[in-house]
Amino acid sequence: MSEYNASYRRIFIIGNGESRKDFDLTQLRKHGKIYACNAYYRDNPLPDVLVAVDSTMTHEIYHKGIAHKIPCYFREWTKCPNFMYQTMKQGFLSTQGKDKEDKFVTNGDSALPIGDYFVMNSHTIKGEATIRREDGTTYKKMVDNTHIYNSWITPGDKTQEWEDPGYHAGATAGHIACKYENPNEVYLIGMDLRSDTKYYNNIYKGSKHYSSAHYEPSPTGIWESEWLQVFKHNRWVKFYKVNKSDDDKLTNTKLLGDEQNLEYITQAQLLDLLKQK
């Protein structure tokens, strides 16, 4: 856990944009609490709080035991009594007109209850999909896949009850930090709103539960809109959007307007700033 002075509440929100790839995040530990998103836990020391909003990631994180080590905020994480297990599973399938799922992911026996409570979610892709090959060419394919994700709840987990604003993971982490930590300052690191290349911008692209490294950049207008809502709803908090540098790369573009409680700084400026505090 962090070694920071709790009398001054500083939060670092860590996104998974590629701008943070070579930035040593361990330098932040003594200066504030670290809120991170999704697969951050895979290759970094555990943050103080982990946020995930997609069922593929929430169940991965739970199955890895992370939710028993640190507080985790998961979307659609409703714990159901075990007698509902088969009924809920069949309900997911019947809504898709299927007798059997295409993939079932669980941390226990797929047929028998192994605990008092469980969380179950489904993910369906149905219709015509555009498939991108590694050489950049594409082709059309009809798909109809239903994946079901299940987690048997084990004692001592730190999943949280919370008010979900419905944002993507980054802005959701910002919302949670402001609501429950009452911070003085919030720093956005690796929260890239654009891509410097013609490809998807994410450190974990191409890995399990992430889009292919060959995908086009994600449309990000909704991300910007969500962050602006976080700024406006927390006027008393000073926000810093930490870019890798101040050059003209797309990831360094000042896309979040000129909100009075928002300032743009570089990673180098962040380190200088923390030395003074």
Question: Which sequence ranges carry the predicted segments?
Answer:
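Metal-ion/cofactor- or nucleotide/acyl-coenzyme-handling active-site neighborhoods
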Residues: 1-277
